[in-house]
Swiss-Prot record:
Protein name (database record): 1-(5-phosphoribosyl)-5-[(5-phosphoribosylamino)methylideneamino] imidazole-4-carboxamide isomerase
Organism: Psychrobacter arcticus (strain DSM 17307 / VKM B-2377 / 273-4)
Enzyme Commission code: 5.3.1.16
Biological processes, Gene Ontology terms: L-histidine biosynthetic process; L-tryptophan biosynthetic process
Keyword Isomerase: yes
Gene from which the chain derives: hisA
């Protein structure tokens, strides 16, 4: 597992634009850029070692909507690890994205509905599969967070511990886009109980959150941040240097 977490800028795509939602509500969005490729370039220039892309329309529609934009970003930064989630429901989509140059594909809703699909994807694309677990009050949510299930996030994580999943992206829906601080307790608990490295997401606001997560580098391999770096309450480069111990 990773001893030094990496800061991972989020680029959420909606209608061809770079946006941020509040608690996953599509109607409650803030547009930060009309040019997602330029936004990716900005974060790379500021020191990003990895990017987190989300096809929001894809997550709600169940099919990829932003293929061209995603391909353009991957082409612009061929050596940069890029992960993507949203609308990944079949093997063909995974293959197309990996062929386009993406490093990791995040399976969310499909992982809940069909765990065997995750195992198959891990066999077919070993080392490239991440499971996205979105939760509200510890319970898994699916379909772009529109549906809260009766499955515990920790229970879902345990199902994938031995099938070859690279890591878990854990998002606390209640905090996502709200700038209320990261849920350290649930994030660390998921990593310890699930047995897989976790990428923390949702609620990261400023350096205080980075400081709270740093001690858990043995189980948290990345920290996704969106609104905080877009609104300037967190400096990406400064945060990464802090995690690096510099």
């Amino acid at each position: 597992m990773c001893a030094v977490p990496v800061i991972i800028p989020a680029i959420d795509l909606k209608d061809g634009k770079c946006v941020r939602l509040k608690q996953g509500r599509m109607e409650d969005d803030t547009v930060f850029s009309d040019d997602p490729v330029a936004m990716a370039a900005r974060w790379v220039k500021e020191g990003a070692r990895r990017l987190h892309l989300v096809d929001l329309n894809g997550a709600f529609d169940g099919i990829p909507v932003h293929k061209q934009v995603v391909h353009d970003i991957a082409k612009a930064f061929p050596k940069l690890p890029i992960q993507l989630g949203g609308g990944v429901r079949n093997m063909q989509t995974i293959e197309q994205y990996i062929t386009a140059g993406l490093t990791y594909i995040i399976i969310g809703t499909k992982a809940v509905e069909d765990p065997d699909f995750v195992a198959e994807a891990c066999r077919e694309f070993a080392g490239h599969i991440i499971v996205g677990i979105d939760a509200k009050d510890g319970m898994v949510a699916t379909h772009g967070w529109a549906n809260v299930t009766d499955t515990k996030a920790t229970e879902l994580a345990k199902r994938f511990a031995d099938v070859g999943v690279s890591s878990i992206v854990y998002t606390d829906i209640a905090r996502d886009g709200m700038m209320q601080g990261v849920n350290v307790e649930q994030t660390v608990n998921l990593a310890r109980e699930g047995g897989l490295p976790v990428i923390a997401s949702g609620g990261v606001t400023d350096m205080k959150d980075i400081e709270l997560l740093k001690p858990y580098g043995n189980c948290i391999e990345g920290i996704i941040t969106g609104r905080a770096i877009y609104e300037g309450t967190l400096d990406l480069g400064e945060a990464q240097l802090y995690l690096d111990g510099k």
